Amino acid sequence: KDEYITILQVSVPAPNLSPNLTCTITNTSKKKSKTFKLPETRNSQSSKKANPTPQAKNHYIEATKPTATKNIVGAMAPSNLNVNILTTFTHHQMSSWLMCEVSGFYPEDIHLWWLSAQTKMDPINFVTAQPVRQSGDKFQIWSVLRLPVALSPSLDTYTCVVEHEASQTKLNASKSLEISGCYHLLPESDGPPRRPDGPAFP
């Protein structure tokens, strides 16, 4: 009984050319061999068509080249949040101003609002600036709240609330503003209005 050994060889003459397929069949009993070239198969033709264009090939090479990694700052929650009193007035026709300052966060997308006694305040009462870039790709933002001092005769607490994607929970800072000492104007027939126990207003 004759026995045969089949050897398939694949050689690539050039990177942009189709591979050469040759097959050698050897009869081990008669010690005879026959080698012939195989025609291109559909797979080899497909591989030829699938060769990347020079532009695509360049993109691939650039993508596989070892490049120095750039330090990209990940999302960071605000590192500083505080509320300060800008001005306080006791004139019944004037307003007090609170400023909320938030800094050290990334990316710049952030949501800020104010609460008064745990009640969300109308956005018409405050103005929030656009985030400003700090050093190291961090951002900073301010929001100013306007408060009529005659709004309440008691100690009121105002809270600045911040929501950022890097924070697991909402962040907040509060400031209490006592407006029970606001002055009341007394009507007078002559001269400028006066405080009950003080000099006339300029």
From Swiss-Prot:
Residue pairs linked by disulfide bridges in the UniProt entry: none
Region of interest: Disordered: 32-58
Record-linked Gene3D superfamilies: Immunoglobulins
UniProt-listed SMART domains: IGc1 (SM00407)
Signal peptide: none
Residue span(s) of domain Ig-like: 66-178
A Pfam family matched in the record: C1-set
Alphabetic keyword roster: Immunoglobulin domain
Polar residues: bias regions: 41-56
PANTHER family: TAPASIN
Remarks, miscellaneous: This delta chain lacks the domain corresponding to the CH2 domain of human delta chain.
Protein name: Ig delta chain C region
Species per Swiss-Prot/TrEMBL record: Rattus norvegicus (Rat)
